[in-house]
Structure formats: structure tokens, C-alpha cells
Amino acid sequence: MPNPLQKSLHGYLSKIKKETGKLQLSSSHSFSSSKNWVLGKHPKKLSFSFKHRRRSSKTRFSKEEPVYHQDSAHAATLSDIDRFLEENFKSLCIRDDQEDDQHQARVTKNKEKRESSSDDSDDDDDDDDYRHRFERTWGHAVYDSPKQPPDLLRTERLSPPPGSSEGRPSMETTSTSSERQSRSTLVLPENCIAVLRYTDEPQEDFRQSMVEMMESKLGMRESEVDWDLMEELLFCYLDLNDKKSHKFILSAFVDLIIALREKEKRITRKGHVRSLSTRAARDRLRKRMIMSDN
């Protein structure tokens, strides 16, 4: 009986020894797994794997890179990661000069396109905004003339009401800037209405409008110039228009003043000649009367 008992006991002890070995192996494997998890969650990631790597001619790695064997480690250490980032910093964070130039050119081109499109939309918005403010200021007494191309200067006109029996003052103004102030407090001359008009020759239109207003006020007869009226009209033109249009208004006003000065001089000379001729006629008549008495 000693042999069967010895065999069974030997078998039992061998089983216990095998189970103990399995437990130790499992414990060491779990420790290795926890160690790999602490050092890196992806130990086999190609970005940090240096095992059996072949360096090509274009790689930037140093020749002194450590080559790890299969039994040395399963994951990259923190020092390996730092070395990798340090050696490849330029390739990761710095663009090449050519790429920078191309990127800058694309950014500049896109910016120019946005600015050009925004300028066009701003011009349209300025036109619409100014038209609405013009209509709110002058109410329903607004007549719109056929619109010219957008590159032409835009004008406004104050003209006599339709069907008027007598000539009424008319007034033109231009506007080219988006910075227009509210004109709700402006008082127009009597029997004048505001009319929006477009023109490509603002100075000539201003001058013609001033001439029409003077003729409607003074009539076709030759008489002295009403300078108070001219001053009132000038300030009215300036108040109605933007500052960039003032140069056209002043140029037209100067041209009109020169013409009116010449006209006034002619009227004065004619009156002086008429007075001289009348005095001479009286002197001749007096002499004849004296001679007849004698």
C-alpha cells in the first residue's frame, strides 16, 4: 500500500505546486500590465516605438537613437517621448518658408475679396439709407428722376411744384459721402419741395439751378442783384449737401457771382449814360430858351 499512497500524495503535491506557479505568473503579469499602463496607454503605437526601425534618408532622427530589443521594454518611457519631441520640434510646429508664403498669399487674396464685396454692399446700403432718410425728412414731396449708373454722382433737386402759375425757385444738391447728417431742422425757401436727382456734372447743374432761382426771383428784367437772397441760397445749398459736395457749390456760386457782377456793371453804366444824355438835353433846351428870349 505504500506505493499507491505515495503516488497519490506525490500527484496531489504536484497539482498544488502547479497552481502556485500559475498564481505567481498571473501576479507578475498583472504587475507588468499595470506598469505598462502607467508608462503609456498605447505601448505599441508606431509614433513611440523604436524597435527594429529603419531610418530613411529623409528622417530627422539622430543616429544615436537607442534601439530596444524585444525583451528590454514594451513601452516608451517619458525620456523617450521628450527626446522624440525635441528632435522633431521643427517638423511638428514650424512651417516651411514656401508654405508660409502660399498661406499668406491665400489669406491676402481672401481678405481682398471680402473687402471688395463689402465695399459694394456698403455703397448699396449707403444709397438705400440716404434715400430713406431723405424721404423721412421731406415727407411725400419727393420726386425721383431716372437713376444713372452707380459711378455717377448723385444729386438732389428742389424744384417748383407742378402746375405752378409763376416761376418758383429751384435748388440742386449733390451727395457722394456716406457720412450724411440729418436735415430735419432745415427750413426751405417758400414754395420749394425736395426732389432727388442724379447727375454727372454737379457743378454745372448747381450753376444752372442758381441762375433759375435768380431769374424766378428777379424776373427777366434787368435790375440790381439781391445779395441777401444770394447769401440765403448759398447757405441753403451748403446745408442740404454733404461736405464733399461743397466744392462744386462754391465753384458754381463764384461763376454766378462773376456773371452777376458784370451784369450789374453794365446796368450801372447804362444808367450813368442815360443820366448824362438827359442832362445834356436839358442844357441844350435851356440855351435855346435863352436865345429865343433874346
From Swiss-Prot:
Tissue: Expressed in roots, rosette and cauline leaves, shoots, stems, flower buds and siliques.
Compositionally skewed regions (Acidic residues) per UniProt: 118-128
Compositional bias segments (type: Low complexity): 164-185
All copies of domain OVATE, residue ranges: 195-259
GO biological process: negative regulation of DNA-templated transcription
Chief location: nucleus
Source taxon at top rank: Eukaryota
One Pfam family recorded for the sequence: Ovate
Key words, A-Z: Nucleus, Repressor, Transcription, Transcription regulation
Record field: compositional bias (Basic and acidic residues): 61-72, 96-117
Places the protein is found: Nucleus
Region (Disordered): 49-72, 96-129, 141-185
Biased composition (Basic residues): 49-60
PROSITE patterns per UniProt: OVATE
Keyword Nucleus (UniProt): yes
A cellular-component GO term for this protein: nucleus
Cited PANTHER family: TRANSCRIPTION REPRESSOR OFP14, TRANSCRIPTION REPRESSOR OFP7-RELATED
Subunit structure of this chain's protein: Interacts with KNAT2 and KNAT3.
General remark: Plants over-expressing OFP14 have no visible phenotype.
Biological role stated in the UniProt entry: Transcriptional repressor that may regulate multiple aspects of plant growth and development through the regulation of BEL1-LIKE (BLH) and KNOX TALE (KNAT) homeodomain transcription factors.
Protein name: Transcription repressor OFP14
Organism: Arabidopsis thaliana
UniProt gene name: OFP14
